[in-house]
Amino acid sequence: MAAKDVLFANDARQKMLKGVNLLADAVKVTLGPKGRNVVLDKSYGAPTITKDGVSVAKEIELKDKFENMGAQMVKQVASKANDEAGDGTTTATVLAQSFINEGLKAVASGMNPMDLKRGIDKATEAAVEKLREMSKPCSDKESITQVGSISANSDRAIGEIIAEAMEKVGRNGVITVEEGQGLDNELSVVEGMQFDRGYLSPYFITNQENGSVELDNPYILLVDKKVSSIRELLPVLEEVAKSSRSLLIIAEDIEGEALATLVVNNMRGIVRATAVKAPGFGDNRKAMMEDIAVLTAGTVISEEIGLELEKATLEQLGSAKKVTITKDTTTIVGGAAEASAIADRVASIEKQIETTTSQYDKDKLQQRVAKLSGGVAVIKIGAATEVEMKEKKDRVDDALHATRAAVEEGIVAGGGVALTKIAKELADLKGDNDDQNVGIRVALRAMEEPLRQIATNAGDEASVVANAVKAGDADYGYNAATGEYGNMIEMGILDPAKVTRSALQFAASVAGLMITTEAMITNHVEDKELDI
């Protein structure tokens, strides 16, 4: 087993604190509308310029192992806030730095670390409750635009395009962000269910101009296995031919004789049939096939449930108003299902979203809900250079997450004002003893720090701004972008309550751990002597 280095008590905490401050000082300069840029060196290509706190935090690894432990713990705060609410990473880092600095000063002066932690936890719980009381619902387009604009570093164009996307696909709709080709941002909405599988043969193409297959009012046959023998398909093909309607076959794969016969029938005009592979892989494929079955009021022909392809009937086929297939995608519009069947399926998937812990699985399930609900919006980012494109895409991702969080838990006054007001309201909060009271004061002082940092980044005197804001009424605050004081809600400076809540909770959590740390252990690194 490798030798270890061990540090105890104040020596350990001071090393850890140095790492915390190194990371937090690099991240906090990006906070607010006048936040500064940070340039990140890359091992290849041009440097990246960013104002995204979590991007800065992810880049930092320190040489000293003990200092690095402190930095990594604060990095975890930023990542957790990002995972929970998709934004608020810089706020969480600023809060954590203040909690830890003030908390460790109290420990150094002889306070009981456990009581300090209890005091911090008590103040945090009370603040979260106040946040819930303060939050106002965010449902209209203008509020969503304002939240998106603030999160995208006061870029109103980004806020507007996100609000428009949400209006078109609904709150549960999937909105994806891609790199565009031009200089302007573009929004496109794909109606119906789309999945990334194209036609299996170019001979199926019906629209030669754009190279796509267009089927009007087709039957849809869903099969969960490979089809290579035409004998299995013949009975259902004959039934479809009698009905004079076209047919879309979605199967695990269609190859050999079966595919060749479909192509020949298509070219001769006997049966207008087109084949595509089923979307997804493994269990996800089965789930998506079931989704398509629900949407089109059909049945998945599966031997697992005793259904054979040779015995398939027209009643087991789904149908839709229109299907468009390109070489890469298939879009089903106007499935024949009743609204109640789709609603039941969506409710079932939403229950899975609540129980799953994997973010990847959540995203996949959310996409399935959106496809069933009828829409996917794609925001294409326009920029002049690759560096600008990356920076802008980061901001749009942040803004998108922030607007979702705002719709979920409501909005509060932005610019660090909500936490500053809460700190003022909780001034009389008391713990069970003097050390807990110090912990409460540490937490209340930390809650003012985001406002102070926003003012500092804007070139203003932090204490003057903080005192002026505390002297005002409920939503009175400071607009760092213009240098004006006023009602933050009316000025459109809003923060999602969920972002503020998660930033505070995660910062308090990691601060409690650091304050109560008494020893640090890391692998010993021996200095290698140079051979001369």
Swiss-Prot record:
Database matches in Pfam families: Cpn60_TCP1 (PF00118)
Entry function: Together with its co-chaperonin GroES, plays an essential role in assisting protein folding. The GroEL-GroES system forms a nano-cage that allows encapsulation of the non-native substrate proteins and provides a physical environment optimized to promote and accelerate protein folding.
Assembly and interaction partners: Forms a cylinder of 14 subunits composed of two heptameric rings stacked back-to-back. Interacts with the co-chaperonin GroES.
InterPro entries in the cross-refs: Chaperonin_Cpn60_CS, Cpn60/GroEL, Cpn60/GroEL/TCP-1, GroEL-like_apical_dom_sf, GROEL-like_equatorial_sf, TCP-1-like_intermed_sf
UniProt binding sites for ATP: 30-33, 51, 87-91, 415, 479-481, 495
Keywords carried by this UniProt record: ATP-binding, Chaperone, Cytoplasm, Isomerase, Nucleotide-binding
Gene Ontology CC terms, in alphabetical order: cytoplasm
Main location (coarse class): cytoplasm
Location(s), subcellular: Cytoplasm
Entry-linked CDD domains: GroEL
Molecular function terms, GO-annotated: ATP binding; ATP-dependent protein folding chaperone; isomerase activity; unfolded protein binding
Enzyme Commission code: 5.6.1.7
Species assigned in the record: Vibrio parahaemolyticus serotype O3:K6 (strain RIMD 2210633)
Catalytic reaction equation(s): ATP + H2O + a folded polypeptide = ADP + phosphate + an unfolded polypeptide
Family: Belongs to the chaperonin (HSP60) family.
Coiled coil ranges: none
The name this protein goes by in its record: Chaperonin GroEL 2
Swiss-Prot/TrEMBL GO biological process terms: protein refolding
Tree of life domain: Bacteria
